[in-house]
Amino acid sequence: MNSIQMLVGLANPGPEYANTRHNAGAWFIEQLAARYNCTLKHDPKYHGLTGKVIIQDQEFKLLIPTTYMNLSGKAVGSLANFFKIPVESILVAHDELDLEPGVAKLKKGGGHGGHNGLKDIIAKMANQKDFMRLRIGVGHPGHREMVTGWVLGKAAKADQEKMDAAIDEAVRCMEILAKDGVLKAQNRLHSFKP
């Protein structure tokens, strides 16, 4: 029923970026790892923090690239190639400007929408775009020129609480994804209200 084998959370490395909106994807992987008692370990071979969890008797590889965001494909490609994981069996969690805080959506395929992490993954995966995305809403600052400062900035407390709630729900939905597939997980996640 489920074909996902690898879960990736995009981020920039280092303490100065840890709590910035751009690291929302990594927050998802950290929460998932904590829920399933997995300790993420740095693995230079895969250019990231790696681990594995068993959900509903299925193994999922976890990855948070420790490259900068615009080099995320290096880490994703390394792990996927080593374990022979096809692109459509990868789920990438990332911050999404076009969704409000408190909203998270699962989507298959698509473009990069200007997201440098997605852009690099697509480039390193021979232009294949069919991986799943977990889009975690961080809201939009209103003007294009303000986007960089926005994603590299920290959210207000109320927005952070909404994002945390959406991520928590997304983590719970991985159980549904493993048991009943993407569509059921999508239905549950897309009806969530923080």
From Swiss-Prot:
Keywords: Cytoplasm, Hydrolase, RNA-binding, tRNA-binding. CDD domains: PTH. SUPFAM superfamilies: Peptidyl-tRNA hydrolase-like. It catalyses: an N-acyl-L-alpha-aminoacyl-tRNA + H2O = an N-acyl-L-amino acid + a tRNA + H(+). It is found in: Cytoplasm. One of its GO terms (biological process) is rescue of stalled ribosome. Transmembrane segments: none annotated. One of its GO terms (molecular function) is tRNA binding. It is an enzyme of class 3 (hydrolase). The active site is at H22 (proton acceptor). Coiled coil: none annotated. Its EC number is 3.1.1.29. TRNA binds at Y17, Y68, N70, N116. Gene3D superfamilies: Peptidyl-tRNA hydrolase. The record marks N12 as: Discriminates between blocked and unblocked aminoacyl-tRNA. The record marks D95 as: Stabilizes the basic form of H active site to accept a proton. GO terms for cellular component: cytoplasm. Pfam families: Pept_tRNA_hydro. The keyword tRNA-binding applies. It comes from the Bacteria. Hydrolyzes ribosome-free peptidyl-tRNAs (with 1 or more amino acids incorporated), which drop off the ribosome during protein synthesis, or as a result of ribosome stalling. Catalyzes the release of premature peptidyl moieties from peptidyl-tRNA molecules trapped in stalled 50S ribosomal subunits, and thus maintains levels of free tRNAs and 50S ribosomes. Belongs to the PTH family. Monomer. PANTHER family: PEPTIDYL-TRNA HYDROLASE. This is Peptidyl-tRNA hydrolase. It comes from Pseudoalteromonas translucida (strain TAC 125). The gene is pth.
